[in-house]
From Swiss-Prot:
Keywords: Membrane, Transmembrane, Transmembrane helix. This is TLC domain-containing protein 5. Its main location: membrane. The keyword Oxidoreductase does not apply. It comes from the Eukaryota. GO terms for cellular component: membrane.
Length: 245
């Protein structure tokens, strides 16, 4: 069983590495980070779809059955995601592209997945955490691509930012709090699994503070821009009215 899990994780790692190399060859004029973010975007879409299917259709429901035995589909998805996080953590360390908070998030994710796979249980809530963590990931990558291509300061960029902040606050913080509560009050999950859940939620709040600061600064900037434009238009209307007299 352990050998099969290791092989699945290694195959996943090899798959993500191969996808990254393929993107690098197809997009030779782009940076390494561009191609890595394409891999991240692909993983985000794939993991959202798979984890949503597990949580909402295949089951079991994470809010009522935390600590339950892993299903075969959960194991496959966790191995797929484990390979990705190992790839991305190695990439971030090699290129020194991320700070301690993101590295801590990836490390906790890897440890959480490994624990669930080794125990053979708690895949239900780990899968739910995966869904909550990845649901904003595609938006984050789209935002980066918009900035790189010079299209960020537009209506599309504003929509992406709004959806990102709203989803992060509502799902990762709001729904995440409910999931953590269910995890803590349930007698089934192991105590160290609960500690890992608390650690992941603390990391989410650290991200949340940074996101709220960004949202506040952008809102203030947008407000001042609107006020300035409104004042200029008002002045032009007044000047035009005076000239007619």
């Amino acid at each position: 069983m352990a050998l099969a899990l290791c092989l699945q994780a290694l195959c996943s790692l090899g798959g993500w590495l191969s996808l990254y190399v393929s993107f690098c060859r197809l997009n030779k004029h782009r940076s390494y980070e561009w191609n890595c973010r394409l891999v991240t975007f692909t993983h985000g879409i794939l993991s959202i779809g798979l984890s949503a299917y597990i949580g909402f259709i295949d089951g079991p429901w994470p809010f009522t059955h935390p600590g339950s035995p892993n299903t075969p589909l959960q194991v496959h998805v966790l191995c797929l995601t484990l390979g990705y996080f190992i790839f991305d953590l190695g990439w971030c360390i090699y290129f020194r592209s991320e700070g301690p908070l993101m590295l801590a998030h990836h490390t906790l994710s890897i440890l959480g997945i490994i624990v669930a796979l080794v125990l053979g249980e708690s895949g239900t809530e780990v899968n739910a955490v995966l869904f909550g963590s990845e649901i904003t990931n595609p938006l984050l990558q789209i935002r980066w691509f918009l900035r790189e291509t010079g299209h960020y300061h537009s209506f599309t960029g504003d929509v992406v930012d709004f959806l990102f902040v709203a989803l992060f606050t509502g799902v990762r913080i709001g729904v995440g709090a409910c999931l953590l509560f269910c995890e803590m009050v349930s007698p089934t999950p192991k105590w160290f699994v609960k500690v890992g859940g608390v650690a992941m939620y603390v990391v989410s709040w650290c991200f949340m503070f940074s996101i709220w600061r960004f949202a506040w600064r952008k809102s203030i900037k947008k407000y001042h821009t609107w006020r300035s434009r409104w004042s200029e238009e008002r002045q032009l209307r007044l000047n035009g009215h005076l000239k007619t007299h």
